[in-house]
C-alpha cells in the first residue's frame, strides 16, 4: 500500500521548475525600477516645460541659461529682468530628477528653443541604455 504524499523526486522536480521560473522572471522585475525612474523623469520634464511655456507667455521670452530653472521659482535678479513675472512663481519648487540630480536647462537648446535634460542614472552627459540622458526633445 502506497503512502499518501510526495516522493523526494517529485519535490525536486517542483523545486527545479520553480527555480527556472524565478530565473526567467527575476530579470524582468529587476529592470522595473529603472523604467519607473525614466517615466518619472519624463513627467517631471513635461511639467517643467509647461511652466517654462507659462513663463514665456507672461514675459515674452524663456529664462536665459544663466537665470536657469530657478527663474520658475523666484524672480530672476540677472538681466533680462522679467516685467510680468507671476507672483508666487511658476513652480512651487524645482524637482530633482529621480536619481537626485538637478535638471539641466539650456537656452538656446541643442534640440529646440530650449532643452531640459536629466543626465540619467550615471549623472553625466551622454551615455547609452540606462545611462542615457532624458531630454525634453524626447517627449
Walk through the language-model features, giving the residues of each.
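A generic structural-conservation signal
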Residues: 10, 65-66, 81
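Hydrophobic positions in long alpha-helices of the protein kinase catalytic C-lobe
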Residues: 41-45
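Short, surface-exposed interaction loops/tails
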Residues: 31, 35-39, 50-53, 59, ...
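Compositionally biased, charge-rich terminal segments
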Residues: 57-59, 76-77
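Acidic, glycine-rich loop-and-strand cores that form catalytic or ligand-binding grooves
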Residues: 69-87
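Generic N-terminal leader/processing signal
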Residues: 1-2, 26, 35, 40
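N-terminal single-pass transmembrane signal-anchor helix
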Residues: 2-29
